[in-house]
Design a protein with these regions (language model features):
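Short hydrophobic beta-strand element within catalytic cores of glycosyltransferases
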Residues: 309-313
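Nucleotide-activated donor-binding/catalytic signature segment of Leloir-type glycosyltransferases, i.e.
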Residues: 253-271
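Short alpha-helical donor nucleotide-sugar binding micro-motif in glycosyltransferases
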Residues: 148, 270, 278-284
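Conserved acidic donor-binding segment of nucleotide-sugar-dependent glycosyltransferases
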Residues: 324-325, 329-335, 344-349
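N-terminal subdomain of nucleotide-sugar transferases
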Residues: 1-45, 368, 402, 406-433, ...
Length: 482
């Protein structure tokens, strides 16, 4: 099968969804014999060759200061759409409701193939973080839900993710398709554990608690640190290891210093080597993941792969499938609840090991198994699409452009309202940036010119909307040349 995978993040940006796309592409190419192409926004000076599948990096705009670390892709990129179309995929799987799904719908219009969409994360939280609360957030969410509703098969990574999608206004059907992990089942070698943890103060017999992920407050890091202070106040021995980086790392390190618990807390910084991450999961006695933001909690299953049980928040998505004191631990969302559990758990490390073994046996799922299940669903979708039993979604070029492109691009990048101070910082790269923005403008012309004869009755204000967007882009280009 010829498969097109689309996502708004890909190396050099490594996040949970980028990891999903890479595993899908690798396993389908190497293990299942499929032909795969990946479309993603381009980052400057990045080599996209060397993968066992083709990566089409299309033009993007630098919004890294506005949307921490991420660029905003141009879903109307002529060269990007053209190359993906030339690949002639039989199915398109998009993993982000923003630029990727706009591009998927453009491709579908040309190729007449089904679109699968996976809802990975709570985008209302991401949008609010990028643009704040208010009208822009509301309109961006509305556009994204419209985008998702236009897809032929909607997947969510957990039951809780589906409930969150419903809360945003999505009314269609969806199915739960779980992600896997690329950790081999089982603990890593003692030698690798010793090598990886060398130089860190980890006394034998003292419980080691572990967190792996972005050091962001919404991940529940403050709750962990508050709980650790309670343990220290009671003179309970422990070591806490935070693996990862993030925008809130300095603030959290300062919080640890203010509490006077620095001797017990280790911040390793980001670790990208998978074998070293396995080693930390093997060395630890308990994984702490008090996040109510994450919809799947892949790190919880990575810990389980190494026989490490997790502490999770009651009713969170990450806690789905967890039975308290059987294959994990469930607490209320407050530091006192976590501190009480850690105090009790520290008394019997052998019991923690048994719960970790149960987690390995009961909640572990490999990426190979997960992708094979997804691939089987592709076959079902394609068959229904071709024999007419899968209802076709109505496509509207004007809706696609105005309700999706302009709102989503504005919502995630605020391209047209970029402040002059930010423009000044980009001035040295403006020649390249100007060409990319002009490509967005040219894409608007292409869509306008491609409106079919059957749309003659579209109201004049729709065309006025197109003209207004073009004028804003022209104004932006002119300001950058001043």
């Amino acid at each position: 099968m010829r498969v097109c995978l689309l996502n708004d993040s890909f190396p050099p940006i490594i996040d949970g969804v980028a990891n999903v796309v890479m595993n899908y592409a690798r396993i389908m190419t190497e293990n299942l014999g499929d032909q795969v192409i990946v479309g993603t926004p381009r980052y400057p000076d990045v080599d996209y060759t060397g993968y066992p599948y083709e990566v089409v990096a299309y033009s993007s705009v630098d919004t890294t200061d506005l949307v921490k670390g991420y660029r905003t892709g141009n879903p109307l990129s002529v060269s990007g759409v053209s190359r993906l179309s030339d690949f002639k995929p039989e199915i398109i799987h998009t993993h982000c409701p923003a630029s990727s799904t706009i591009m998927a719908r453009v491709l579908q219009k040309e190729l007449d193939v089904p679109i699968v969409f996976t809802y990975h994360t709570k985008f209302d939280v991401d949008i609010a973080r990028a643009v704040g609360e208010g009208f822009l957030k509301k309109e961006t969410i509305k556009a994204m839900v419209s985008n998702i509703s236009a897809c032929d098969d909607v997947w969510v990574v957990s039951k809780g993710a589906g409930e969150n999608l419903r809360s945003l206004g999505y009314e269609g059907e969806y199915r739960v398709v779980s992600n896997g992990v690329d950790f081999q089942k089982g603990k890593t070698s003692d030698a690798l554990v010793k090598e990886t943890t060398a130089g860190f103060d980890l006394p034998e017999g003292v419980p080691v608690f572990l967190f792996v992920g972005r050091i962001m407050k919404y991940k529940g890091i403050p709750l962990i640190i508050d709980a650790l202070k309670e343990l220290s106040d009671k003179d309970i021995k422990y070591r806490m290891v935070f693996v990862g980086g993030g925008a809130d790392a300095e603030e959290m390190q300062e919080k640890v210093r203010e509490y006077g618990i620095s001797d017990n807390v280790i911040f390793t910084g980001p670790i990208h080597e998978r074998d070293k991450l396995r080693a930390w999961n093997t060395r630890a006695d308990l994984f702490l993941f008090p996040s109510v933001y994450d919809t799947n909690g892949i790190v919880v299953r990575e810990a389980a792969a190494c026989g490490l049980a997790s502490v999770l928040i009651k009713d969170s998505c990450a806690a789905e499938g967890i039975t308290h004191d059987r294959n994990g631990f469930i607490i209320e969302e407050d530091p006192h609840s976590m501190a009480a559990l850690l105090e009790e758990a520290s008394k019997d490390l052998s019991h923690l090991a048994q719960v970790g073994q149960n987690a390995m046996d009961e909640i572990y799922i490999s990426w190979d198994e997960s992708v094979r299940d997804a691939r089987n669903r592709y076959d079902e979708i394609l068959k229904m699409f071709r024999d007419g039993t899968l209802p076709r979604k109505k496509w509207s070029g004007t809706e696609l452009l105005l309700d999706s492109a302009s709102k989503i691009i504005s919502g995630t990048g605020e391209i047209f309202n970029t402040s002059r101070s930010i423009q000044e910082g980009m001035r040295e790269n403006f020649a390249e940036f100007k060409d990319e923005v002009r490509e967005v403008r040219d894409g608007l012309y292409d869509v306008r010119d491609g409106i079919h004869d059957g749309l003659h009755d579209v109201k004049s204000e729709i065309r006025d909307g197109l003209q207004e967007i073009r004028e804003k882009i022209d104004e932006f280009i002119d300001r950058g040349q001043e």
